[in-house]
């Protein structure tokens, strides 16, 4: 989203690019369009709307959402837009002490899901960028502890039980495909991607999926009252 925010993409250019993408991939079965790009939806609203409406008109067979900045959610800006098929929030990579936003949800990603679930019109929601496995807490300070499989499991179950339609798993090494010979990786990467894919968090996501699909998917209703002492 930085190119758009920097004023390097006009509304007309955005439409042309979205039309090209839609034409190229409209017959592919595994496409979900992520409008935005790790950015506040309040930045260059007209461009994001142009892209969203173009996808809706030119490729109605694929879902469209918006990838927001850390500790924000797409519903703040686009929930009522017809091009937004489902909401996405980014709980981000900060721990409780590092979150300096007004909401101060910190690691409580379930709060974003709970908020979206109660909106009208009803739309699905999920955490599109929670803390990734094996990435430093807060991203940039490599002296901080690294998020592990216990953390990603916690985020996954918390958000799904609060009403999310699914979950996004990420791994620091795999995200950047870090490999031998790369001069310098990002975010304190310590593993190669082909080792990272075998870390425990990735393999454990299947258990949540199995649980979600063990009952009729569209009949799931979150009930936070079942949780005693917030899981402590």
Q: How would you name each of these model-derived features?
A:
Residues 75, 84-103, 107-150:
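Active-site clefts of carbohydrate-active enzymes
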Residues 24-29, 57-59, 115-123, 162-164:
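A structural motif corresponding to the C-terminal end of an alpha-helix
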Residues 22, 52, 113-117, 156:
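Short amphipathic alpha-helical segments and helix-helix/interface helices
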Residues 6, 10, 14, 44, ...:
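Residue-level preference for long, well-ordered alpha-helices that form the structural scaffold
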Residues 3, 76, 137, 178-179:
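Short Asp/Glu-rich motifs
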Residues 121-125, 133-136, 152-232:
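Aromatic- and carboxylate-lined catalytic core of secreted/periplasmic carbohydrate-active enzymes
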Residues 1-98, 108:
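Active-site mouth of glycoside hydrolases
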Residues 31-35, 63-66, 85-89, 124-132, ...:
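Structural recognition of the beta-strand scaffold that forms the well-ordered cores
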